[in-house]
Amino acid sequence: MIPVVIEQTSRGEASYDIYSRLLKDRIIMLTGPVEDNMANSIIAQLLFLDAQDNTKDIYLYVNTPGGSVSAGLAIVDTMNFIKSDVQTIVMGMAASMGTVIASSGTKGKRFMLPNAEYMIHQPMGGTGGGTQQTDMAIAAEHLLKTRNNLEQILADNSGQPIEKVHVDAERDNWMSAQETLEYGFIDEIMANNQLK
């Protein structure tokens, strides 16, 4: 069930679902697994807010275990494409593809709540259902390219050498807010009274 907010306006009462009300304040909630439908919704909101006023920041709250690489990269590319600065605020967790999205916020405007967590690791993949050796080889090569691409993005976003990111992402690597700050994925640990 999605909560509804009722506001008094000059014309009487207006009711909004909570996400529409937050969107009026340029707040987007990226929660749950990253998949195509969710990514399309996030992208549409980013484009709408940028078209509405590209001089104002957009606030992207992130709480995700990660998910689809292609869906996540579509969000990242849109964040980089629009003119509005995108503040990212990690609450709960940003794991896997979520770290790529959250760390791609505008530098200087990437935040994390004190008890949130970050997790980087190498991408997972399969053979795409093919059982032929050539299909498996193609899938393995694609997975390596994907890993290199994601590690380059994480290196660029954190300021760490790609070799360090490669080693650190070999297995699930969980980080506290302080460790995430020291790594360079965020710019500040946000106190609860700083939230928009």
UniProtKB/Swiss-Prot annotation:
User: What's the domain of life for this entry?
Assistant: Bacteria
The entry's localization annotation reads:
Cytoplasm
User: What Enzyme Commission number(s) does the record list for this chain?
Assistant: 3.4.21.92
**SUPFAM superfamilies according to UniProt:** ClpP/crotonase
Checking Pfam families in the record gives:
CLP_protease
Active-site residues (renumbered): S96 (nucleophile), H121
Q: Which UniProt keywords apply?
A: Cytoplasm, Hydrolase, Protease, Serine protease
GO molecular function annotations of the record: ATP-dependent peptidase activity; ATPase binding; serine-type endopeptidase activity
What GO cellular-component annotations does this UniProt entry give?
Answer: cytoplasm; endopeptidase Clp complex
Task: Please tell me whether the keyword Cytoplasm is annotated for this protein.
Answer: yes
Q: Which reaction does it catalyse?
A: Hydrolysis of proteins to small peptides in the presence of ATP and magnesium. alpha-casein is the usual test substrate. In the absence of ATP, only oligopeptides shorter than five residues are hydrolyzed (such as succinyl-Leu-Tyr-|-NHMec, and Leu-Tyr-Leu-|-Tyr-Trp, in which cleavage of the -Tyr-|-Leu- and -Tyr-|-Trp bonds also occurs)
Broad EC category: hydrolase
Question: Which biological process annotations from GO are given for this protein?
Answer: protein quality control for misfolded or incompletely synthesized proteins
Question: Any keyword Protease?
Answer: yes
Q: Which family does it belong to?
A: Belongs to the peptidase S14 family.
On subunit structure and binding partners, the annotation says:
Fourteen ClpP subunits assemble into 2 heptameric rings which stack back to back to give a disk-like structure with a central cavity, resembling the structure of eukaryotic proteasomes.
This molecule's function is given as: Cleaves peptides in various proteins in a process that requires ATP hydrolysis. Has a chymotrypsin-like activity. Plays a major role in the degradation of misfolded proteins.
> What name is this protein filed under?
ATP-dependent Clp protease proteolytic subunit
Q: What is the lineage of its organism?
A: Bacteria, Bacillati, Bacillota, Bacilli, Lactobacillales
